[in-house]
Amino acid sequence: MIYITGDCHQDFERFNIDVFPEQKEMTKDDCVIICGDFGGVWNRNEESSREAKLMDWLENRPFTTLFVDGNHENFDRLYAYPVEKWHGGKVHKIRPSVIHLMRGQVFEIDGKSIFAFGGASSHDIAGGILEPDDPDFKKKKKKLDQGWYPYRVNHVSWWKQELPSEEEMQEGIENLAAHDNKVDFIVTHCCASST
């Protein structure tokens, strides 16, 4: 069985047994796919104790947790996990059954082919993106903190990798071509702004 949900932003309450009782009948062969903004890999430099508890809690659910990335992920840390093959595509395993589905990959899950392509452009950056090594960082941040415009800090709360690279797009095209450009499902965080 495959279940799909949206943004979690590190809030996994929806996976409590009281909220999601279907899991009583699930096994690790069953999957829950989060369509971006997983948020479980967020702390700046390393896994925090809170993240470790959350990831261990997800690992102990009876199902396998899968996610594509959104625009609110710590890509420095996410991309530091080893790349592995899983069900036909490339992944990062956060835990044995907490798995990041990498962009441009086709997975065979529960008899279905699934094309995964995460990422999105941040809409919450009207105030701009600050550089932490800017000599005027504190002054700029203080000014933005007093205003209404949301902003992000490069490699702290925003990463350019939120948008797919040319290589990821090309790999996606090649992987789709290898499947005759036919899959059962496409899992992404956000549709193109041109649609």
Task: Give the residues covered by each predicted segment.
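Extreme N-terminal starter segment of soluble prokaryotic enzymes
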Residues: 1-3
